[in-house]
């Protein structure tokens, strides 16, 4: 029995270390909607004190703590339905994007677990979105510059063609007048 208990404690420690070393903010709610597990990244992402999550609060209490950064009740209601509604149509993976009041972009995904539990993972993708936006802006600027260059070359080509045609005409005329 002692070896079973030691093995159990070891597995719990491995699980906790694994969760705490994830970049993603992870929470697990049981079928009754109570918080069962979370990692440090979750508390950091939502700017929560660890003692706020210590007594296994229910989903609504956790949302109340997170609402200072993200206020859209419709999204929280959608996530809650994935956590607390046992119906098979709600026990499915879902995902979305949040834009928080502190200008961060967070993606979220829900994943049903055995025994009615639900895992929710949040990831701060602000930096990636900023890079994506910068690359799109740069691409648009390069396309606009290329268009301007093409228009300029066409215009210069036309402007040069007209005088050259005239000069060629005079040259042919002069050559035809030579004895």
Language-model-derived ranges and their functions:
Residues 1-15, 84-95:
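PAS-family sensory modules
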Residues 16, 20, 137-176:
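Primarily the dimerization/phosphotransfer
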Residues 27, 31-90:
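PAS-family sensory domains
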Residues 13, 19-32, 44, 99, ...:
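Long compositionally biased, domain-poor regions of proteins
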Residues 1-9, 113-144, 149:
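Sensory coupling linkers of modular signal transduction proteins
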Residues 65-130:
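PAS-family sensory/regulatory modules and their coupling/dimerization elements
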